Amino acid sequence: MILKMKRIDFENGSVTQNIFAAALPMLVAQILNLLYNIVDRIYIARIPHIGTAALGAVGLCFPLVVIITAFANLFGSGGAPLFSISRGQKKNKQAVHIMNTSFSMVCFSAVVLMLIGLLFARPLLILFGASNDALVYAFPYMMIYLIGTLPSMIAIGMNPFINAQGYSTIGMFSVAIGAIANLLLDPFFIFVLGFGVRGAAIATVISQCLSASFVLYFLTKKAELKVRFLHKNELSESLGYAKNIISLGTAGFIMQLTNSLVSIVCNNVLSVTGGDIYISVMTIISSVRQLVETPIYAMNEGGSPILSYNYGARRPARVRKAMIVMSAMILCYTAVMWSIIIFAPGTLIRVFSSDPSLVKDSVPALNQYFAAFIFMDLQYIGQTVFKSLNKKKHAIFFSLLRKVFIVIPLTYFMPYVLHMGTSGVFLAEPVSNVIGGGLCFVTMLCTVLPELRRMEDCD
């Protein structure tokens, strides 16, 4: 064994210790996973002569990366809470069927997405805001990245089922394999072999294959509940599970898909109001956001299986305690990071680029974009609780509200109607954080807490 397979007992022991035990390996995993997304950009930005232009071009591929991740999470993050609830109810056979259904849907959708992407890569990039100059770098990167769609989606979509069984350290290791490989392979392919932007994509695909191989090995050979493809005679029974998986996963799917839509809208408006340089600025802001959000995501994912398992086991006191601990951890962390962003933005920006003109334009944009980021925590906490407790309608509604009905309209309204230019694009985010995040969190408190009290009264 590479690692000792220590499991977390979601039903017993300290809730705080359980969340830390689940969240810390996930934090390491997510930090490493972040390398998949930002290491390419760091190295690409330092390619002699073309770094800034190539960075903006690769940033145009970000919506596609988000779409692929969104589909993986639709089936993975949609299935894992149902899997955990079934385990909490001691229905292991049902839990396995849910996992197998998720796995089959992950693989099928990956093949479909890869084929669509390869066929329509150029028009998609133009839709995302690519100019003819940007296509020179964005098109080859996207074509190579698409080849790794299947391993990428397996690694992302099935890792939650490792964590949901209490093997959070194994989940961390599965991400570490690919992330470390990517960190080592990127400079080799980009600079040593001289492949440039293409080299970054090749390194990423190889790394994704390594992660996916480990995830499949563990879930088919070592886990307590093992995964496989659905058999033909199981397809009809799986339709009900598939519907529930998609229903629950739709909230996170919408949240990620609308991230992609917002990115497309921002790039299109910025290309008109600020030119290609502001596409690069937005790429840096997106990278900083990923850097900041990674621990938040880890804390949410660390708390989610504990919420789901104890909700299924009808242990409302532990559900309530998990909500409080998870919320406190996230809010404290974000307060620290928000202070760094507001008072020392240049430090974070220079991680991705040392171009003086790019840094100069990025500093005010970063401050505007993150002005009310702490309110975004309220959205994350509310969404995680709704998803973990199988509250599909609430999760879906609040995913749509902030991005589709607040951010996107403001991204057009503030630059064009209020004549705020590029600042309007970046300020749309904090306005949506305050409105959307506040409404989501208050609704969560008003719906979930009374239900937990009723559960206590019944028991």
What residue ranges belong to the model's regions?
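N-terminal transmembrane alpha-helices
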Residues: 10-50, 63-78, 82, 107-114, ...
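Alpha-helical transmembrane segments and their lipid-water interface positions
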Residues: 29, 33, 37-44, 69-76, ...
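Small-residue hotspots at the loop-to-helix junctions and early N-terminal turns
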Residues: 52-63, 138, 142, 201, ...
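Small-residue-rich hydrophobic transmembrane alpha-helices
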Residues: 55-115, 152-171, 267, 279-339, ...
